Curated annotation (Swiss-Prot):
Basic and acidic residues bias (residue ranges): 132-141
Entry's family note: Belongs to the requiem/DPF family.
Stretches annotated zinc finger (PHD-type): 256-314, 316-361
A Gene Ontology BP annotation from the UniProt entry: apoptotic process
Free-text function comment from the UniProt entry: Probable transcription factor, involved in meiosis and stress protection.
Region named Disordered: 108-204
Knockout consequences: RNAi-mediated knockdown reduces expression of sod-3. RNAi-mediated knockdown on a cep-1 mutant background increases germ cell apoptosis.
GO molecular function, one term: zinc ion binding
Annotated organism of origin: Caenorhabditis elegans
Biased composition (Acidic residues): 142-158
SUPFAM superfamilies: FYVE/PHD zinc finger
Name of this protein: Zinc finger protein dpff-1
Length: 372
């Protein structure tokens, strides 16, 4: 039998170990961490912490207590940069705008005469069948998803669902809304139960703000890489004004390399001083030699910034979806979706790859020069 003093010492050590684990997790909330107890990679989310008032008894005899499951909701997709560039083009060319407006057919709404009743006593507009179903019925599967006792909340839900979503989405499939459409088949209508309660509206998460505006036009981008690509692609002349700050003051910049744990004063692999490059989205740092960067990459990231592998997004569309379709340039380390390139690529090249901007800037010194 263990003594009381020994038991208290074990509890103190356990508290210290838990506090160190939680402190390490709080420092890196944006990245998945490896849980040694379950041997899985987990990600911090609002579902991690549960209160006592969230518990409710389960109908399953093998379950003592369970928590209500919360449905995952995808944020609204941002408008593509092509729409912004098109609006800028039409603003500078009003004659083209007038021609488009002239060719576009105008949709005329129904008049009250066409929808009025045949009798002269009253004039009413009859609501459609779908509107009546939305007001009088509520779909059962929405309640089943929220209150089903067979589904249990877990710390791994957020991480695993994100990985599955990335793997299943194709390059052509684009999600425009997270609201499920109610099928209009006879079998689905028969499952609807009458209810006069107010239909609960779907709450969307606020989309990420575009905090990198262009100093020459009204275009805005979510990442500095997208802004740099926009300025190089649309504005050929070099801007006389200084570029926006590469790193936000709200980001905590790491002063040590994530690969060799060295600093700017000494690289532990080469035993020589070497400047660190930091991600402008999360603040993680690394030595260019530890990242296997060549001189071209170092030159570009000093001017345009750098994104680490976890924060990497497509420079053209600005999203990080379909990361298995991302192609990285060997001269600037920017990421491009295979289907966002012009012309689009079916698969990544077997040898080195250089984007169009690097081929123009470095010429024959690029990793993959343009074919003449």
């Amino acid at each position: 039998m263990i003594s009381e003093n020994g038991y208290m010492d074990l509890m103190r050590n356990c508290i210290k170990w838990n506090s160190r684990q939680m402190e390490d997790r709080k420092k890196r909330l944006r990245f998945p961490y490896y849980e040694h107890q379950t041997a899985t990679a987990q990600r911090e989310s609002r579902f991690t912490t549960r209160n006592v008032d969230h518990m409710y008894p389960s109908n399953d005899p093998n379950t003592v207590v369970q928590f209500a499951t919360e449905r995952w909701k995808k944020s609204k997709s941002q408008p593509p940069s092509d729409a912004v560039e098109m609006s800028m083009f039409l603003r500078e060319n009003p004659s083209i705008q007038v021609a488009i407006d002239h060719l576009t057919p105008q949709v005329v709404g129904p008049t009250t005469e066409s929808v009025s009743d045949s009798s002269n006593d009253s004039t009413t507009i009859r609501p459609s069948r779908q509107t009546q179903i939305k007001e009088e019925y509520r779909d059962d599967y929405v309640l089943d998803d929220e209150l089903s006792p067979d589904e249990f909340g877990s710390d791994e839900d957020d991480w695993s669902s994100r990985k599955r979503r990335k793997g299943n989405l194709g390059p052509v499939q684009k999600a425009t809304s997270s609201r499920k459409k109610v099928p209009t088949t006879r079998s689905s209508v028969s499952r609807l139960t009458p209810s006069r309660s107010i239909v609960k509206e779907t709450k969307y998460e606020e989309p990420e703000e575009k905090t990198y505006p262009c100093d020459k036009c009204s275009a805005k981008y979510k990442s500095l890489a997208g802004l740099s690509y926009h300025q190089s692609y649309l504005h050929d002349q070099k801007s006389s004004q200084p570029l926006v700050k590469l790193l936000s003051p709200s980001i905590e910049i790491s002063t040590s390399c994530d690969f060799c744990s060295g600093t700017a004063f000494m690289n532990k692999n080469t035993k020589l001083p070497e400047d660190l490059v930091s991600c402008h989205d999360c603040g993680r740092s690394g030595h260019p030699s530890c990242l296997n960067f060549n001189q071209n990459v170092t030159k570009i990231i000093k001017r345009s910034g750098w994104q680490c592998l976890e924060c990497k997004s497509c420079t053209i569309c600005g999203t990080s979806e379909n990361d298995d379709k991302l192609l990285f340039c060997d001269d600037c380390d920017r990421g491009y979706h295979l289907y966002c390139l012009t012309p689009a690529l079916e698969k990544a090249p077997d040898d080195e790859y250089s984007c169009r901007l690097c081929q123009v800037e470095f010429g024959d010194k690029a990793s993959a020069p343009a074919k003449k």
